[in-house]
């Protein structure tokens, strides 16, 4: 009998993961959400990792009405990369969380920076209009390293029906 793992051998540094490959439930809040990291498979190289969440949702802290955003997160890893299922669950945990657009956007970026200590990270949060005004929030940790190809986020501005 072989030691065949149905999904392949474990990648280095993944033994401590608590969510990947397991049944999970949506965390009730961003504070309850567990973000996990794994060792970067290409330490010493500069490359960009992009996550796009085109259907991000949260709640207005005053009215309780839903807010929607297209979020793009770009980062250049240091020693760590974020485990994507934990990121998905973290982002989904905002679904019932009341906070202003700016707060949600910056909280996401700061939580990732605290977890990963990346060489560089930026977030573009393109919020759909509320009261007729779209709010876009942009933040980054500083200047990106030279010589790294960082594609434009290319999220078109809100055009309504036009």
Curated annotation (Swiss-Prot):
Keywords associated with the record: Cytoplasm, NADP, Oxidoreductase, Queuosine biosynthesis
Catalyzed reactions: 7-aminomethyl-7-carbaguanine + 2 NADP(+) = 7-cyano-7-deazaguanine + 2 NADPH + 3 H(+)
GO BP annotation list: queuosine biosynthetic process; tRNA modification
Subcellular location: Cytoplasm
Top-rank lineage group of the source organism: Bacteria
Residues holding substrate: 82-84, 101-102
UniProt GO MF annotations: preQ1 synthase activity
EC number: 1.7.1.13
Region (Disordered): 1-39
Keyword Oxidoreductase: yes
Record-linked InterPro entries: GTP-CH-I_C/QueF, NADPH_dep_7-cyano-7-deazaG_red, QueF, QueF_type1
NCBIfam families referenced in this protein's UniProt entry, alphabetically: QueF-II
UniProt function note: Catalyzes the NADPH-dependent reduction of 7-cyano-7-deazaguanine (preQ0) to 7-aminomethyl-7-deazaguanine (preQ1).
Family label: Belongs to the GTP cyclohydrolase I family. QueF type 1 subfamily.
Protein name: NADPH-dependent 7-cyano-7-deazaguanine reductase
Upper taxonomic lineage: Bacteria, Pseudomonadati, Pseudomonadota, Alphaproteobacteria, Acetobacterales
């Amino acid at each position: 009998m072989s030691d065949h793992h149905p999904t392949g051998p474990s990648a280095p540094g993944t033994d401590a993961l608590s969510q990947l490959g397991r049944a999970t439930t949506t965390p009730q809040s961003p504070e309850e959400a567990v973000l996990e990291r794994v060792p970067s498979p290409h330490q010493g190289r500069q490359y960009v990792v992009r996550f796009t969440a085109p259907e991000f949702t949260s709640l207005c802290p005053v009215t309780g009405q839903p807010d929607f955003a297209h979020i793009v997160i770009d980062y250049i890893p240091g020693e760590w990369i974020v485990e994507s299922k934990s990121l998905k669950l973290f982002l989904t945990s905002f679904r019932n969380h009341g906070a202003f657009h700016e707060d949600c956007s910056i909280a996401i970026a700061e939580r990732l920076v605290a977890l990963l200590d990346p060489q560089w990270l930026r977030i573009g949060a393109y919020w759909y209009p509320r009261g007729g005004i779209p709010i876009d929030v942009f933040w980054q940790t500083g200047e990106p390293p030279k010589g790294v190809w960082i594609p434009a986020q290319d999220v078109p501005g809100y055009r309504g029906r036009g």
